[in-house]
Amino acid sequence: MALSIKQFVNFAGFVKDLKSFNFSVYAQYFGYINIIVCMALGIANLFHVNAVIAFGIVAIVQSLIILFVEVPFLLKICPLSENFINFIKNFETNGYRCIFYTLMAIVQWCSLALMVTSLIVVAICLTISAIFYAIAYFKNQEFQHTTNVIKNPTDDDFPHDAVVREML
């Protein structure tokens, strides 16, 4: 019996989140996409012979900061300074996250003044996240973490040790 991603991911919970019309959830999912986009395009823009390299480095740093903002579990398992943890904990509401993403988007939009590169995608994605958080803020929607996507190990259909032993 082979393990597949479907055994670990709760697709019904994902669909439930998408149907919730809670824009903070949409922004959080887009934040996960931002982590990948910022890292990938930040690395890709390190190969320019231009000042755009600085914005590529900033995009990489932004991806790491977004990772800690959107996945707060990492604050507990990674050895970090108290100052950094307190800085990240400032972004626990939709309003502060909207400001956070807006400022990061502005930085990436400024990169276009030097040279139009693939960092425009980073700027667009960060802007979309900021818009989603702004909509959630103005609609007075509660900020909630997406917990419905990964299956709980206590669920009946979660693959347990016996399945892994059978594979081996």
From Swiss-Prot:
GO cellular component: Golgi membrane
InterPro entries in alphabetical order: TVP18/Ca-channel_flower (IPR019365)
Subcellular locations according to the entry: Golgi apparatus membrane
One Pfam entry name: Cg6151-P
UniProt name for this protein: Golgi apparatus membrane protein TVP18
Domain of life: Eukaryota
Glycosylated residues, chain numbering: N22
Function description: Golgi membrane protein involved in vesicular trafficking.
